[in-house]
């Protein structure tokens, strides 16, 4: 899997559609089309201050999934295919921000969710550049961009949307934050240099001009 495909952060649904298409669909045109469709659906709904319902914005995640998902198995080796992940981030972040604003989700809660997502994506990108890609189970458990969008869209049908935002932020924070901290701690112990400070300090008494004076004393 190429780094660009890792940066996409596809979930199980998008990956399944990608395998069905067999990697034959070019990713960039369909992702741009998905972004345009999301913008249109958000522009016509939801209406501010109303409960989420059968409005066009509810179906935006499904439309994006059907457009961008089938291209997820493409190797993304085209000259401009590196644009696909940031466009998907813009779709996801923009959808969550606009939907939260329209559904009266507290601004701090929207900010927390977007911050958790940004840290999740930054960690995945940094680890990939270091040759330590997140394990497959973490990528699947993270639901992917499509799973998170679908969750927030349809969870509002069963409960107030702030609860969905809070639950998603807490879940991703524990999953990504805990696994990331454990991974870096494990690699730090494996690849770091162990220093015996007590020994170093005792040896340091004889080092340098001050140490020489202490030795002579």
Residue ranges and their predicted role:
Residues 1-70, 82, 86-128, 133-217:
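Hydrophobic alpha-helical transmembrane segments
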Residues 72-78:
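Helix-to-loop junctions at the C-terminal end of transmembrane segments
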